[in-house]
Amino acid sequence: IALNNADVNGTKVAPFANSRDFFYGSWFTTDEDWMGKFISSETRDPLPGILGYNNAVLMENSPNKTLACDGALNYINAYRTAVPVPASACEWFLPSLRELADLVDVVSTVNTKIAAAGGEELIENGGNGSRYWSSNERPGNSYVVYQHNLVSGGISTPYRSAGSTAGVFRMMLAF
């Protein structure tokens, strides 16, 4: 997990997108060159694994990216620019619900390690600052992208474009 939340022009809490009527995670199912190469981001309970990376690739290549996930991509790209990764790792990505859920039981331990490394602890104080955007979209509802609350362990389904349900972008990478 990244040592700090992503930041764009001094802002760390933001909406996922500027529009809410588009999906980014299923376009590949009808594209002959991409068909069968990914798992749809439109799922709440993904298979175990590093699906945040899968979902980030779907976002980056989506024909709807300027509407469906522009905010998220701005934060992903800003973090990638600001924080280089080791040659043995993939690029930074926005975690899936599963990857965020895996943090809930170990958040205190993770925070201790992050603090020791001089990073920004995962927020556990409630409010928008503890709602972390996932890279999972809600099936059948183009308005919604899932968030994970590290305080309650709960999952919420806010509108991707509503400022009142803005969340934090915390990146991960895999070796």
Model-derived segments and their meaning:
Residues 1-82, 130-132, 162-172:
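Extracellular adhesion/carbohydrate-recognition regions
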Residues 88:
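Conserved P-loop
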Residues 91:
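Mobile, glycine-rich extracellular loop/lid and propeptide segments
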Residues 97-175:
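C-terminal, surface-exposed recognition/capping segments
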